[in-house]
A protein has these predicted regions:
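Membrane-lipid interaction segments
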Residues: 94-95, 107
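Hydrophobic, proline/glycine-rich low-complexity stretches
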Residues: 1-91, 103
Length: 200
């Protein structure tokens, strides 16, 4: 939603925690897993996080994609991450495209949903298949900040392991997130297991 009046311009500085887009990510490796989704659980997610207010106020309605009732889990390994911005930068420092590289790991779940428009015309012109991400985690803080500030993705910082499993050409992945082991008063924040995957 736009607010009347002048917008505050974004100013890049050498103290920024984000790196300006666009980005170049060569040689990304993806491990993808697909499993049947519980349609009722997907609808509940849509109602809790996407279908806010009344349908008339929103102008749309999210529902599960019943024709393809599956969920996806993806592990991504980015060996090189480079800013490929061609815009001139006047920050008094080396431009980001001329700096070194970084790497990261990323894990997210993906649910295919349908965004239905309102009314007969809306059903034809404003209906689209989209993907929602119930969670997305990354292993590097810069990617976490850029994902939130530049792309609007609620990325969380996590510890992510990716390696070959016990058998040749198998895969093993794990995610650990900050949290509390119990609701007891005084419980100290620690890094807890969140997700483990291993193929045979």
């Amino acid at each position: 939603m736009r607010v009347a009046g002048p917008a505050i311009p974004y100013v890049q500085s050498s103290a920024s925690q984000d790196v300006p887009p666009p980005y170049h990510f060569p040689d990304v490796t993806v491990q993808a897993f697909i499993w049947p989704a519980q349609i009722g659980a997907v609808q509940k997610y849509c109602d809790n996080f996407l279908n806010l207010g009344t349908r008339e106020e929103r102008g749309f309605e999210y529902r599960p994609l019943a024709a393809w009732p599956y969920a996806m889990l993806l592990f991504l390994d980015y060996p090189e991450m480079i800013s490929s911005s061609r815009e001139p930068e006047d920050i008094g420092e080396t431009p980001y495209p001329e700096r070194g590289i970084t790497s990261q790991r990323e894990v997210f779940a993906c649910l295919p949903v349908v965004r239905y428009g309102n009314g007969p015309l809306g059903l034809i012109a404003d209906t689209d298949i989209e993907c929602v991400l119930p969670f997305i985690v990354v292993s590097k803080p810069w990617s976490c900040v850029c994902g939130r500030e530049m792309l609007g993705l609620g990325k969380l910082l996590a510890e992510i392991d990716m390696a070959e499993g016990y058998y040749p050409d198998s895969f093993r992945g794990a995610v650990r997130l900050p949290g509390w082991a119990s609701d007891a008063p005084g419980e100290h924040l620690s890094v807890l297991p969140f997700l483990d995957v291993e193929t045979g």
